[in-house]
From Swiss-Prot:
Protein name: Large ribosomal subunit protein uL4
GO cellular component: ribonucleoprotein complex; ribosome
GO biological process: translation
Region annotation Disordered: where it falls in the sequence: 45-71
Stated family: Belongs to the universal ribosomal protein uL4 family.
Domain of life (superkingdom): Bacteria
Amino acid sequence: MELVLKDAQSALEVSETTFGRDFNEALVHQVVVAYAANARQGTRAQKTRAEVTGSGKKPWRQKGTGRARAGGVKGPIWRGGGVTFAAKTQDHSQKVNKKMYRGALKSILSELVRQDRLVVVESFSVEAPKTKELKAKLKAMNLEDVLIVTSEVDENLFLAARNLYKVDVRDVAGLDPVSLIAFNTVLVTADAVKQIEEMLA
């Protein structure tokens, strides 16, 4: 199959298995959920009454004071006491096979092509790290909510896009399923398309 280059009167020959496969919604959902889960730290930690520092001594005698009976000062109803159902450190990570991960990326890319949301250009760069310059370039192409994918890290482009709302710059190695579906349009250079094909082959 062919992808038309927006900035040149030519087309780029690409693999049907990468850019023309059927959309597998269940697979994409599973991979996106796993990706988000793997980004979680899971480092929250609270103490139960057994773990709180403090005395185990009975604060006052059982009878005769007129106060409610109490067996200790570390219970959940006491200030400084433990938490009833204390949150513990948790590993939220989910295993995703390489084949599934690549399959999800292919599915997303193919759907972007079908919906005309994947824009391929010969090259894309800015002369200086100026947001104004990048904004003007995107406006000329009628693009706002866009993910720019390049073959390698472009420092000028990254710095120019950093302060723009709903604009992000990634190299092929930094591509992930969440960023691909988070933007309305994905702008990819021809070199990046070839790298994506090699990566997902």
